[in-house]
């Protein structure tokens, strides 16, 4: 019994709760519909609004009411007619008011004609939900108040001009699509950033209460029409042109002859920037940048130069049109609207406005071409044009004096070949005869080789006279080929040698041998020397091959595997110096002293003790010490048996411990 009574009480409480909730919802609905009827909309429109839309539109209405109360709006005079309907007809776009947060506080009724979205669907929403994501940063910058950077002007700049891509449900045929299938439409927006101070209000305590000023952006948004939607008769105050992506004319309407005095053929291939006033080129460049990034753009009012002088105020609507696949098939269609007639007709602002200016080279008459060699080299046309089309001459006349048919730049480039190197006289070589300035092509390889050898001998003779033996005197950096030398990299931090280590002895060079250039880098290990049978080195001598002696050389003992490569490397360096008397193109790296040569040995020789570079070697010291490997002595003797009697040089300085004989 008790259980049934508790169950009935629970059901009664639930029913009362449901009735109370139903009553609250009905009262809420009634209040919201009463609120909807108070909004300035038609009764048929407000009756179909949902609760969220009613709240959204009410908040927007309250914002606009505060703006109207704070702003200085022009009131309709007594006896005058209201002009609100005329404003919408005169405007080519719609009016939009944005708050500082980006909410659309107001849009005019004709927004549906441009975007396909009704006024009620947009008011109260954030504009960032309807514009292209790439344009949100630009709009946010326009909504931000800009500081006043000028001391003369008390007010900060409030004017705004930008382009937006906004969602549109209209098709080219006038049909309306779903919002999910909307496309992007470019709108040119221009307006001002306004700050309205609301009227002062009193608090319940009686003290005045001030509110911050209301910031809003009032814009007029105009849709840029596509060129395909324009009617064929544009009128006398407009003309059409087509450009490539670099704004060069590819087509121009014939009406430009009546308006600006240009012929369409004169503009083909010319850039549009050449016919724009210099003071307006920056503003037009920004509009072209917007055009290439968004597909459509409207320029501001700029001055288009007339043919006979002066300019016309013009405004241009540009659209990027694609005729196929790829960027090469794209072009720019421009519709130019003339705002004024030609002003300041007597002022010449560009070369395009002069009659003497032409882009094509002048044609020469037949009589003037007969007596001029080289087809009008001395013609009044630019000199470089004479080399674009040389006359048809025989090869013999070209070979006799080819410099006549070369441009000045080509003459300077071919001067070493056409003029030849200067003759050099050495004691051992007779003076070379002077070569003609224009040799035949068949003689160029041999004579150029002789000239290069003479230049090498001359430079070697000059260097032999000024050889420096002091290690403290650095080589002049101007005489070095810095492009062929590696930068100096100190290796002291990478290889920590013992404190008892000493550098090898310094060897003086004979006066007749040219000083080797100092290397600027040292990598620790010398590069491996390839086998002579696989890669013969330039300047090497086959007599140094111990395995196959020739020319009466007596056979040497069998060498150790490691000593053969060192002997070949050393012989190639000595023999190359004796035969050429010049420096070879590449040398083994060495340390900073200019006369110290690092032999191509392994790292174990570097880690042994050496004497200081300042100490001179004893001429009576033996070439091979008793503690060196026995297989190394014959190879070293073979290096010196074909050399001339010069001061002996020790290429392989022994270690401090091995230099002491028993």
UniProtKB/Swiss-Prot annotation:
Residue ranges, annotated region (Nuclear export signal (isoform 2)): 228-272
Signal peptide: none
Keywords: Angiogenesis, Apoptosis, Cytoplasm, Developmental protein, Hydroxylation, Isopeptide bond, Mitochondrion, Nucleus, Repeat, Repressor, Stress response, Transcription, Transcription regulation, Tumor suppressor, Ubl conjugation
GO biological process: angiogenesis; apoptotic process; response to hypoxia; transcription by RNA polymerase II
Every bHLH domain range: 12-65
Biased amino acid composition, Low complexity: 426-437
PTM annotation: In normoxia, hydroxylated on Pro-487 in the oxygen-dependent degradation domain (ODD) by PHD. The hydroxylated proline promotes interaction with VHL, initiating rapid ubiquitination and subsequent proteasomal degradation. Ubiquitinated; ubiquitination occurs in a VHL- and oxygen-dependent pathway and subsequently targeted for proteasomal degradation.
Region described as NTAD: 450-501
Chain positions found as 4-hydroxyproline: 487
A molecular function GO annotation: DNA-binding transcription factor activity
Cross-link named Glycyl lysine isopeptide (Lys-Gly) (interchain with G-Cter in ubiquitin), sites: 463, 565
Biased composition (Basic and acidic residues): 572-584
SS bond list: none
SMART domains reported for this sequence: HLH, PAS
Stored Gene3D superfamilies: Helix-loop-helix DNA-binding domain, PAS domain
Quaternary structure annotation from Swiss-Prot or TrEMBL: Isoform 1 interacts with ARNT. Isoform 2 interacts with HIF1A. Isoform 2 interacts EPAS1. Isoform 2 interacts (via C-terminus domain) with BAD; the interaction reduces the binding between BAD and BAX. Isoform 2 (via C-terminus domain) interacts with BCL2L2 and MCL1. Interacts with VHL.
Name the record gives this protein: Hypoxia-inducible factor 3-alpha
Lineage: Eukaryota, Metazoa, Chordata, Craniata, Vertebrata
């Amino acid at each position: 019994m008790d259980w049934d009574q508790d169950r009935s009480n629970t059901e009664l409480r639930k029913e009362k709760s449901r009735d109370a909730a139903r009553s609250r919802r009905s009262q809420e609905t009634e209040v919201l519909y009463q609120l909807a009827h108070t909004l300035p909309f038609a009764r048929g429109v407000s009756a179909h609004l949902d609760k969220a839309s009613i709240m959204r539109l009410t908040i927007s209405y309250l914002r606009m009411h505060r703006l109207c109360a704070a702003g200085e709006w022009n009131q309709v005079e007594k006896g005058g007619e209201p002009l609100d309907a005329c404003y919408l007809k005169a405007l080519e776009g719609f009016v939009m008011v944005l708050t500082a947060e980006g909410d659309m506080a107001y849009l005019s009724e004709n927004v549906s004609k441009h975007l396909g979205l009704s006024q009620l669907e947009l008011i109260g929403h954030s504009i960032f939900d309807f514009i292209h994501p790439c344009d949100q940063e630009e709009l946010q910058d326009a909504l931000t108040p800009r500081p006043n950077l000028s001391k003369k002007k008390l007010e900060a700049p409030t004017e705004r001009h930008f382009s937006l891509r906004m969602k549109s449900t209209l098709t080219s045929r006038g049909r309306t699509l779903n919002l999910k299938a909307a496309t992007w439409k470019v709108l040119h927006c221009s307006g001002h950033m306004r700050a309205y101070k609301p009227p002062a209000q009193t608090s319940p305590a009686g003290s005045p209460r001030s509110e911050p000023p209301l910031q809003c952006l009032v814009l007029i948004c105009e849709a840029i029409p596509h060129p395909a939607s324009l009617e064929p008769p544009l009128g006398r105050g407009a003309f059409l042109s087509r450009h490539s992506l670099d704004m060069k004319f590819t087509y121009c309407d014939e009406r430009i002859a009546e308006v600006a005095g240009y012929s369409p053929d004169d503009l083909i291939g010319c850039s549009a920037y050449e016919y724009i006033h210099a003071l307006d080129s920056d503003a037009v460049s920004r509009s072209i940048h917007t055009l290439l990034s968004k597909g459509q753009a409207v320029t501001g009012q700029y001055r288009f130069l007339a043919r006979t002088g002066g300019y016309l105020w013009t405004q241009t609507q540009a659209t990027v049109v694609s005729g196929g696949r790829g960027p090469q098939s794209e072009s720019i269609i421009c519709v130019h609207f003339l705002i004024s007639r030609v002003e300041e007709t007597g002022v010449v602002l560009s070369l395009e406005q002069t009659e003497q200016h032409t882009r094509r080279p002048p044609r020469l008459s037949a009589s003037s071409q007969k007596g001029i060699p080289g087809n009008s080299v001395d013609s009044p046309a630019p000199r470089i044009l004479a080399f674009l089309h040389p006359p048809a001459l025989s090869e013999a006349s070209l070979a006799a004096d080819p410099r006549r048919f070369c441009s000045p730049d080509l003459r300077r480039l071919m001067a070493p070949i056409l003029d030849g190197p200067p003759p050099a006289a050495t004691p051992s070589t007779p003076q070379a005869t002077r070569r003609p300035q224009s040799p035949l092509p068949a003689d160029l390889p041999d004579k150029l080789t002789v000239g290069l050898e003479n230049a090498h001998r001359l430079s070697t003779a000059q260097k032999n006279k000024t050889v420096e033996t002091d290690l403290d005197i650095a080589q002049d950096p101007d005489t070095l080929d810095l492009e062929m030398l590696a930068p100096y990299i100190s290796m002291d931090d990478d290889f920590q040698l013992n404190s008892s280590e000493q550098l090898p002895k310094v060897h003086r060079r004979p006066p007749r041998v040219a000083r080797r250039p100092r290397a600027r880098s040292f990598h620790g290990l010398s590069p491996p020397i390839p086998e002579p049978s696989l890669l013969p080195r330039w300047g090497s001598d086959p007599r140094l091959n111990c395995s196959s002696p020739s020319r009466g050389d007596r056979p040497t003992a069998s060498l150790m595997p490691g000593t053969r490569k060192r002997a070949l490397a050393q012989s190639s360096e000595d023999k190359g110096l004796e035969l050429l008397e010049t420096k070879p193109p590449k040398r083994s790296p060495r340390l900073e002293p200019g006369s110290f040569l690092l032999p191509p040995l392994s790292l174990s020789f570097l880690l042994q003790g050496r004497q200081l570079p300042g100490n001179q070697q004893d001429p009576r010291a033996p070439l091979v010490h008793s503690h060196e490997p026995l297989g190394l002595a014959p190879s070293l003797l073979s290096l010196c048996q074909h050399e001339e009697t010069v001061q002996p040089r020790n290429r392989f300085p022994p270690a401090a411990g091995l230099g002491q004989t028993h």
